Structures are given as structure tokens and as C-alpha cells.
């Protein structure tokens, strides 16, 4: 009971000796007292030590076991206390890893008299030498002590832990030093020289060796390259790398993408990361690149500008008209409203080939817009500049020296008349001597009678005239060079006549009129007599002009506003016997105005005759007979399928309708031609009604056999004030209201209008939507929520009901 430290040390020595005698490798450390009430707990350990000593004495019969037990006892007696104090934690780990089942089996064998025993470590070593799988050590942890049998905790020695850490640090430093010495041992120092540097033969030998190695490496590389080419390995490798290179996303894939920033916002040498701009789920459009930081900066700048609230009226403010790229800025009036009316102007540009963009295209477009804006007339005057003695190339292009026009006046030696033969196409022999146009610039022209007689004889010999050339006056306007008519020009200075330009115009007009008259002559070439009459008419007209007209007015035609207005009206044909159809000849001949006004009711075939023409009074009767012979015998009947008015007009022309309007017009008509027309219609009516009025009071005596298969399909439809077709019920209601003079009430009218609106909505409904447009509303909701779906939560009853809570 009152044991001291000496007695406790002897017990521990005895315990360790017994454990060594059993041949076990594990050592049981001494249990230190944890509390005063557990200081006599070691008596149990002494009893267990006695059992171990008994077993050791039984095994001590053998020599080897006895020797091992003595050595273990001596070792434990010498160093037992020191080990227990230095390494308590290590012994605890070994004690926890001990297999209690194996120890029990070993103790049972020892008690049965088997003297040989091996530990698990030794058994595993033997099994490893034999190539067998080592045994597994089942570490069975002892249960923690209970309240009745507590287990003493191990004492932690901080000095031992510190010494262990210092030893580990020393070992690590030694290992690092050893590795460093091994690495530096291969490097030569400055004091050590190679032997081949001082010896020439050694240097030559080394150089030859290096050259041989180099040649051998080149041969090997060449051989490998030939083998690759022979088997196609290099081609396959190149194709593989090329395919990988093409599959990689590179700068060429950026061509055509839009960057939604101004190009001047990117500074040179600055790296900017662009990402795809977010857009709606249902939004379809091209991808746009933006930078998040730049977007935030632009938004912040805009907010700053809005916060400033600058005054709008700045009459003397001068904004910078040039931007950073030395380009002219567009200036607009009331620019503060541009963004509100036109929306925010986007600043963007497109990437070109290779993902590059220099902004050249945007600047060109801006220059074009500026030029278009500056095309308007400006009040800015040109600034002063130094006068130059020479013209610039641009001014030389615009400079054109006016050429003085000298009038060529012929001598009035011989005047010839225009003949039909002059209009014949020239032959090869007549090309040089032919007349290319009028060379005579005189006023009055005297016609030679001999020339006229020759013209008449030629016309009689060849009544069929050749087709004249076109009425293009460009041939007559040609000017022949001075070499051809050098003798015709006067030697002195040319005498310019008054109003020469006007006279020249009149001559050209007269020439065109003659060409048109000869064209009429070609149309009447089938009759020689008619050609002769036209020639005589021309002759008489020319003679009459020579006798009656003034010499100043010869060969001219007088134009005034009235004649031009009447000529441009053209022919306005009017149908009917009392119409005012034009004669075959033109109404614009001033010589026959009075005669035409007297005989305006004569008929004509309405043949188109454009231009100026003159006819003698003696021949007027012949032309009237000619025109009367070409009139149509039957009048034109109006087309019935054009409408009810055309059908009534047809009945009126045939005399089937008896109208009082025509009878009144017959009595009160101021024109003489109207009664004759009415009389003809009345006469026709009498002839047509000769048999119809006789059967008027008789009735039908027989059926219409030709109408046996006729079954009329009558469909009566009524429409309202908006043009909508009414149903039979609605039509009856409308007629009833109109007859009785009353209408529907307010409620009925509103219900009817609501029903009509619903029908109109149903007709206007899209084929892919409901009448109320719920599909469009669904798409708008998805666009607002930025999701491709919509969540329907709860029912209509629960959503509409009012929830009452306490």
C-alpha cells in the first residue's frame, strides 16, 4: 500500500523482463497516476507481471529463449526508465496496433507447451521472402476507460517534441546540402581548364569528332525525311496540323461583325476585350460586339450630361466644327430635339477582313453626307485669293472660247422651185452635184415659168412619185464648207439683213410644209389626175401669193397665240349627224377660215391630216364630194355591255323609246342640223312601231318557245349604310323601321354594334392567333421576362378571389 518510487521501478523492471521473455516486441509503458485516488492501481499490473514471469520461466527451458530473455531483461533494466520518459507516444501507437487475437493464440500455444513463436512483423518478413501476401494487422483500439476503471492518459513531454523537430530540421538541411553539392559538382570552375584548349592535337581531334557527329545527325535527319516522304507520313502530319489550324477560331472569323462603339473611342495601343451583346430570347438579329466597361462609361457620360441641364439658348456659342480625326462635324439646328425625334443615333462600325477596322469607310460615308448637305446654295462668299497669270488645268476644262459665227449670204442670181424630182434619192453620179440643202438666204423667190412647165411634164410622164425623205430638217440645216462654194461668196464684207434669224425660221417652216404636202402627194400616187391637181393647186397658190402678198411677207407664215392654241387642240371627233367633224383639209388655213365657218356642218371621214395645207375655192366642191363618198352607210352602234346607259342609247338610236326631250329639242333647237337628226329618228320610230303598236292591245297569243329552258335566278340583296350585306332578318327589320318610322332602342343597338365588332375582329383575325390576340400578348410577355416560356401559377378562381386573413 505504501509503495515508494523504488518499489514501483522494480515492478516495472520485472514487467518488462517478463514481456521480453515471451519474445514479444511490444512494450507496455508504465501507467502514471492521474489522480490521488488511483495511486494504488498498479497492484493489478504487478499480478499481470507475475503471470508473464511464470510463462517466461516455463519457456526458459530452452537455451535460445533464455538468452533472449536475459538480454531483454538487461536492456530493459538499463534503459527502461529513459524510454518510458522519452517516447511515450510511440509506445502507445505500437500498443494500439497490437493484435490481441494473435497474442491470445500465442499465449495459448505457449501454455500448451509450444516453445517457438513469431511476431506478425517477422511473419510478414518471411512471407515477403517467400513471395506471399503479407498478413494484415488489425489494429483493435481499446475502449476508453469507464468511470469505475479509468485509463491514465499519456504524458506529453514538450522538450522531447522540440528535440524531435530540431532533429528533423537538421536532417532536411543536410539532405538539401547534399543535393546541391551533387548538382554543382558537375560544373567546372574558372580555375579548371579543359585539356584540349592547350593541346593542338587534342583540339583538332575534338573538332573532327564534333564534325562527324554533326554529319551523322544530318544524315539521320535526311534519312528520316526521305522515309516520311516515301510512306507519306509528312503529308499526313501537315494535313492534320493544317486541319487543326483551320478549325481554330481565328481573326478571319471576325469579318463582318458589328462593333457597337464609335471607332474613335478605341485608343491606339490599348487592349479592349469585346463580348457578344445580350439580346432578347425572341429577338432575331446579327451578333453585336460590345465592351461592358465602355458601355458603362457611355451611360455614365450621358447621365452626367443630363444632370448638367445646360441652358438651351446659346446664341453666341461656337462649337468645335472639327473632330479628333480632322473631319468636319455636321451642324444641325435645334440639335437638342434630334435624339427625341429620330432616336439615339447608334455609333457602330464593321470589322473588315482579318478583324481589322481603320474607319476609312465610315469617314468616306460621312464625307459623302457632308457634300450632299453642302450642295444647297450657301451665302458664304469666296475668300480673297491671289490672281494667277495662267489658268489651272481645272479652269482650262471649264474654259471655252466662243466662236464667232459668220453668216453666209448667197447672191440672188438664180432661184429655183422645189420639185417632186428633187426629193428622189440621189444616184451615185448625182452625189457630187446634188443639193444638200437650201443655200439661198433671200427673202422673196421668183419662180421661173419654164421650170414649172418642166415639173408638170415630168409629173405627167411619171405620175407615181417616189417616196420622199423624212421631214427631218437636219439636212437642210447643213452648212457646206467654204471650199465647195468659194465662188458664191461675195468678195466684199457680208451684208447682214434685218431679222435674219426670224426669216430663216420662216423659211425652214415653209420647207417643212412643202415636204408634208409632197408626202400627201405620195399617198395619192394611185391617181395621176389627183397628182396633177395638187401641182396646179401649188402653182395657183404661189401665183396668188406673188400677186397679192407684200414682198416682205413672201415665203413666210404668221403665227399668233390663237392659231397655235387651235392647232395644238388636234381633232376632237363628235359622233352624230349634227356633229362638227373636220374636213379632210386642215382647218388652220387662214385663207379659208370664213368659208369653213359657213360650211362647218359638212361631213368627213375623219382622216388624220396634220400640218398646214391650202386649197382653192374652186376645188372645194370636188373635195366635198370625195369626202362624202367615203362616209360610212351605217352608224356606229354603242356597245350594250358597258352598262344601262349604253343600252338606253341603243334603244334611243333604234327608235324604241319615245322621249319628250327630243321633241322639245326639235322645236327649240337653234341649230339647223338638229331637226334633221330628230326627224330621222322619228321616222325610224314610226317604221319600227308600225307593227309593235298594232299588237300593243292584243296581248301575247303564243308562248316564247325559245325561252322554254330559261330559268331566271333572281337574288335580291340589301346592304346597310356601310356597304355590308344584310341577312333577311336584318333587311326586314330595316324595311319595317323605315315603314313605321321608328327604330330600335339603345340597348339593342349597342348589342348589335358589339356583335358586328366581334364579327369584324373575327374576320381580321390572324390565322396563327386568337381573336383577342393572346399569342401576341404571350410573345410580348416572354420578351419582357426574357424567357422562352411563361409560368402559369394557380387557377383563375384562386387568382380572382379576394383572400381574407385575420
Curated annotation (Swiss-Prot):
GO cellular component term of the entry, any: U2-type precatalytic spliceosome
Position(s), cross-link Glycyl lysine isopeptide (Lys-Gly) (interchain with G-Cter in SUMO2): 125, 133, 141, 147, 188, 277, 329, 336, 400, 414, 554, 654, 663, 690, 705, 715, 729, 755, 764, 781, 786, 797
The protein's role, per its UniProt record: Plays a role in mRNA splicing as a component of the U4/U6-U5 tri-snRNP, one of the building blocks of the spliceosome. May also bind to DNA.
This protein's UniProt keywords: Coiled coil, Isopeptide bond, mRNA processing, mRNA splicing, Nucleus, Phosphoprotein, Spliceosome, Ubl conjugation
Name of encoding gene: Sart1
Name of the protein in its database record: U4/U6.U5 tri-snRNP-associated protein 1
Organism: Rattus norvegicus
Subunit field text: Identified in the spliceosome C complex. Component of the U4/U6-U5 tri-snRNP complex composed of the U4, U6 and U5 snRNAs and at least PRPF3, PRPF4, PRPF6, PRPF8, PRPF31, SNRNP200, TXNL4A, SNRNP40, DDX23, CD2BP2, PPIH, SNU13, EFTUD2, SART1 and USP39. Interacts with UBL5.
Phosphoserine sites (modified residues): 321, 348, 481, 527, 597, 602, 604, 627, 767, 795
Pfam families: HIND (PF19252), SART-1 (PF03343)
Domain of life: Eukaryota
Similarity-based family: Belongs to the SNU66/SART1 family.
Residues bearing PTM Phosphothreonine: 189, 431, 701, 770
Low complexity bias (residue ranges): 104-119
Amino acid at each position: 500500500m505504501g509503495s515508494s518510487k523504488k518499489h514501483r521501478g522494480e515492478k516495472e523492471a520485472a514487467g518488462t523482463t517478463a514481456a521480453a521473455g515471451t519474445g514479444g516486441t511490444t512494450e507496455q509503458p508504465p501507467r502514471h497516476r492521474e489522480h490521488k485516488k488511483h495511486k494504488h492501481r498498479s497492484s493489478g499490473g504487478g499480478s499481470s507481471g507475475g503471470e508473464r514471469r511464470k510463462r517466461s520461466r516455463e519457456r526458459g527451458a530452452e537455451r535460445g529463449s533464455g538468452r533472449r530473455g536475459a538480454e531483454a531483461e538487461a536492456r530493459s533494466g538499463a534503459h527502461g526508465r529513459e524510454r518510458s520518459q522519452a517516447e511515450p507516444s510511440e509506445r502507445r501507437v505500437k500498443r494500439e496496433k497490437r493484435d490481441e487475437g494473435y497474442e491470445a493464440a500465442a499465449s495459448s500455444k505457449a501454455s500448451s507447451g509450444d516453445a517457438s513463436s513469431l511476431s506478425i512483423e517477422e511473419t510478414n518478413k518471411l512471407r515477403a521472402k517467400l513471395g506471399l501476401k503479407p498478413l494484415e494487422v488489425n489494429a483493435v483500439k481499446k475502449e476508453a476507460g469507464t468511470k469505475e476503471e479509468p485509463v491514465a492518459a499519456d504524458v506529453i513531454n514538450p522538450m522531447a517534441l522540440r528535440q524531435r523537430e530540431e532533429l528533423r530540421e537538421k536532417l532536411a538541411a543536410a539532405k538539401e546540402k547534399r543535393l546541391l553539392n551533387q548538382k554543382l559538382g558537375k560544373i567546372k570552375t574558372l580555375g579548371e581548364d579543359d585539356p584540349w584548349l592547350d593541346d593542338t592535337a587534342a583540339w583538332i581531334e575534338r573538332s573532327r569528332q564534333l564534325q562527324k557527329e554533326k554529319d551523322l545527325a544530318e544524315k539521320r535527319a535526311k534519312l528520316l525525311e526521305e522515309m516520311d516522304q516515301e510512306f507519306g507520313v509528312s503529308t499526313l502530319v501537315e494535313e492534320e496540323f493544317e486541319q487543326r489550324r483551320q478549325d481554330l477560331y481565328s481573326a478571319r472569323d471576325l469579318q463582318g461583325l458589328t462593333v457597337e462603339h464609335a471607332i474613335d473611342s478605341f485608343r491606339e495601343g490599348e487592349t479592349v476585350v469585346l463580348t457578344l451583346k445580350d439580346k432578347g430570347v425572341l429577338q432575331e438579329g446579327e451578333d453585336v460586339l460590345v465592351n461592358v466597361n465602355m458601355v458603362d462609361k457611355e451611360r455614365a457620360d450621358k447621365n452626367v450630361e443630363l444632370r448638367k441641364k445646360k441652358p438651351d439658348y446659346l446664341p453666341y456659342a461656337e462649337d468645335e466644327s472639327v473632330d479628333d480625326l480632322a473631319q468636319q462635324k455636321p451642324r444641325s439646328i435645334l440639335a437638342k430635339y434630334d435624339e427625341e425625334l429620330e432616336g439615339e443615333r447608334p455609333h457602330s462600325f464593321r470589322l473588315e477582313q482579318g478583324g481589322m477596322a481603320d474607319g476609312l469607310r465610315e469617314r468616306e460615308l460621312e464625307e459623302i453626307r457632308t457634300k450632299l448637305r453642302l450642295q444647297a446654295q450657301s451665302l458664304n462668299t469666296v475668300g480673297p485669293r491671289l490672281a494667277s497669270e495662267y489658268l489651272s488645268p481645272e479652269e482650262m476644262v471649264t474654259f471655252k472660247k466662243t466662236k464667232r459665227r459668220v453668216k453666209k449670204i448667197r447672191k440672188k442670181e438664180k432661184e429655183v422651185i422645189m420639185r417632186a424630182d428633187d426629193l428622189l434619192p440621189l444616184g451615185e453620179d448625182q452625189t457630187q452635184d446634188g443639193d444638200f440643202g437650201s443655200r439661198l438666204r433671200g427673202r422673196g423667190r421668183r419662180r421661173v415659168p419654164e421650170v414649172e412647165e418642166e415639173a408638170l411634164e415630168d409629173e405627167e410622164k411619171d405620175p407615181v412619185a417616189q417616196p420622199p425623205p423624212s421631214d427631218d430638217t437636219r439636212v437642210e440645216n447643213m452648212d457646206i464648207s467654204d471650199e465647195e462654194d468659194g465662188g458664191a461668196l461675195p468678195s466684199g464684207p457680208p451684208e447682214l439683213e434685218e431679222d435674219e434669224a426670224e426669216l430663216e425660221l420662216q423659211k425652214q417652216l415653209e420647207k417643212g410644209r412643202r415636204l408634208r404636202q409632197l408626202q400627201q402627194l405620195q399617198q395619192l400616187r394611185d391617181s395621176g389626175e389627183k397628182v396633177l391637181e395638187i401641182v396646179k393647186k401649188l402653182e395657183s397658190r404661189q401665183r396668188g401669193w406673188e400677186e397679192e402678198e407684200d414682198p416682205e411677207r413672201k415665203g413666210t407664215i404668221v403665227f399668233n397665240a390663237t392659231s397655235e392654241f387651235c392647232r395644238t387642240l388636234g381633232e376632237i371627233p363628235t359622233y352624230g349627224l349634227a356633229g362638227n367633224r373636220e374636213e379632210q383639209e386642215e382647218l388652220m388655213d387662214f385663207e379659208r377660215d370664213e368659208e369653213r365657218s359657213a360650211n362647218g356642218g359638212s361631213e368627213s371621214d375623219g382622216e388624220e391630216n396634220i400640218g398646214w395645207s391650202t386649197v382653192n375655192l374652186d376645188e372645194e366642191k370636188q373635195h366635198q364630194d370625195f369626202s362624202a363618198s367615203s362616209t360610212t352607210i351605217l352608224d356606229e352602234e354603242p356597245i350594250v355591255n358597258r352598262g344601262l346607259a349604253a343600252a338606253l342609247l341603243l334603244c334611243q338610236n333604234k327608235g324604241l323609246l319615245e322621249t319628250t326631250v327630243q321633241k322639245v329639242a326639235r322645236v327649240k333647237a337653234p341649230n339647223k342640223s338638229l331637226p334633221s337628226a330628230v326627224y330621222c329618228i322619228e321616222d325610224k320610230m314610226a317604221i319600227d312601231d308600225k307593227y309593235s303598236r298594232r299588237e300593243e292591245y292584243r296581248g301575247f297569243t303564243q308562248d316564247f318557245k325559245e325561252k322554254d329552258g330559261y330559268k331566271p335566278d333572281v337574288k335580291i340583296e340589301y346592304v346597310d349604310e356601310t356597304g355590308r350585306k344584310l341577312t333577311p332578318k336584318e333587311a326586314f327589320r330595316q324595311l319595317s323601321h323605315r315603314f313605321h318610322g321608328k327604330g330600335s332602342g339603345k340597348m339593342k343597338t349597342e348589342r348589335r354594334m358589339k356583335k358586328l365588332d366581334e364579327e369584324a375582329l373575327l374576320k381580321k383575325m390572324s390565322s396563327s392567333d386568337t381573336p383577342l390576340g393572346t399569342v401576341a400578348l404571350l410573345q410580348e410577355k416572354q420578351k419582357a421576362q426574357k424567357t422562352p416560356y411563361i409560368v402559369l401559377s394557380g387557377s383563375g378562381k384562386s387568382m380572382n378571389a379576394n383572400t381574407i386573413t385575420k
